[in-house]
């Protein structure tokens, strides 16, 4: 069909076999049972969809459409489905399941849309309707705008019964089809491409910039015809995502001192993560990204929360709070819960006591332990 080699008979058989296969699937489903008419429509549609999936996908994942093609082959072998409307020579009667008799059935309207799609890609000629003037036999491409009253239809006597003779108002004209529907209209293009018709430059309006073709070269998109090689194929997949913004430049923020190192956390930390890129591409009306970039430019000397303890623990270990931090948390918690009616001197003395690092009985600090070991070692060496 794409190359124009399909005949009219083959295309009609293909479209009719599809319609017949769908009718068989719908007739097998118990949705048409008389005792199921009172069930809600959403449950029936859900069961019908599951039933069709079960029919079309129970053989093998690579041959999921095998049952459909088997049904289509049976339909192609069934001659009664492809008889013309005025043919009565079939010995099986005249079931007339062909596509030509299904136009008045609104239940199969979505299925009949496939027939229109098949005919669109076929080289079969189309028929366009033109209005006909009452005083002329030739078709008029434009509708008549004259204000003259339409003539009354003439009457004649047939078996003593007056019969009105009315000329047809519409005539059909056969139009050869040179190419299918324009794929540029139905297929959305890449994002962030300016429309040449919206620009103010007359050169771009008359000669728009060439867009990349199927081979990736800067060639103009060719007009799609019945040849498969001339169908325009987009290099970029259709997506609803916003265009990705470039990642910020990577710089080394490690200080010369080995004990102090500052590695800021960025939103765009992993360039391979599409989620991070999507967040980074969002608009920033509150200036959050500028604040993050400003924090990156700060020197480690400006960081007041970096201590020697934070440089000692490695990346894989979890940091344990120091005794001073625990004491400050307890102090702030107790200060908030204190009664304001107490004397200020008593609260100040308690604050001074709480600020001192508390040493539990039986547990000594690391510095004291090392100093004692040094003293004990020196005393033991003197004794020897």
Swiss-Prot record:
Composition-biased stretches (Basic residues): 343-363
Bias (Low complexity) ranges: 143-157
Residue spans of biased composition, Acidic residues class: 302-315
Pfam family, one: DUF1509
Basic and acidic residues biased stretches: 316-342
Chain spans, region Disordered: 133-257, 297-368
Signal sequence residues: none
UniProt name for this protein: Uncharacterized gene 12 protein
Organism: Gallid herpesvirus 2 (strain Chicken/Md5/ATCC VR-987)
């Amino acid at each position: 069909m794409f190359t124009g080699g399909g005949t009219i008979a083959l295309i009609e058989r293909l479209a009719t076999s599809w319609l017949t296969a769908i009718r068989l699937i719908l007739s097998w489903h118990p949705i048409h049972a008389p005792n199921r008419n009172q069930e809600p429509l959403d449950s029936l549609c859900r069961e019908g969809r599951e039933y069709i999936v079960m029919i079309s996908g129970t053989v093998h994942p690579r041959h999921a459409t095998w049952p459909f093609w088997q049904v289509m082959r049976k339909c192609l072998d069934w001659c009664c489905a492809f008889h013309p409307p005025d043919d009565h020579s079939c010995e099986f009667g005249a079931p007339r399941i062909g596509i030509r008799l299904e136009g008045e059935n609104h239940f199969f309207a979505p299925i009949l849309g496939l027939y229109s799609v098949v005919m669109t890609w076929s080289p079969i000629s189309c028929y366009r309707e033109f209005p006909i003037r009452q005083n002329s036999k030739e078709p008029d491409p434009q509708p008549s705008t004259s204000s003259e009253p339409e003539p009354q239809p003439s009457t004649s006597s047939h078996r003593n019964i007056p019969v009105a003779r009315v000329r047809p108002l519409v005539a059909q004209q056969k139009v050869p089809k040179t190419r299918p529907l324009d794929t540029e209209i139905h297929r959305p293009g890449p994002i962030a491409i300016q429309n040449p018709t919206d620009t103010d430059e007359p050169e771009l309006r008359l000669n728009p910039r060439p867009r990349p073709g199927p081979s990736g070269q800067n060639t103009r998109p060719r007009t799609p015809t019945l040849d498969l090689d001339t169908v325009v194929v987009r290099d970029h997949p259709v997506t609803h995502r916003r265009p990705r913004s470039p990642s910020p430049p990577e710089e080394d923020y490690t200080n010369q001192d080995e004990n102090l190192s500052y590695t800021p956390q960025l939103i765009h930390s992993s360039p391979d993560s599409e989620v991070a890129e999507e967040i980074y591409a969002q608009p920033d009306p509150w200036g959050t990204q500028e604040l993050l970039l400003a924090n990156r430019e700060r020197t480690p000397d400006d960081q007041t929360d970096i201590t020697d303890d934070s440089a000692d623990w490695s990346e894989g270990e979890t940091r344990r709070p120091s005794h001073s931090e625990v004491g400050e948390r307890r102090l702030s918690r107790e200060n908030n819960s204190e009664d304001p009616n107490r004397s200020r001197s008593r609260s100040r003395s308690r604050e001074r006591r709480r600020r001192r690092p508390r040493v539990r009985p039986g547990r000594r600090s690391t510095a004291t332990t090392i100093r004692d070991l040094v003293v004990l070692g020196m005393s033991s060496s003197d004794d020897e």
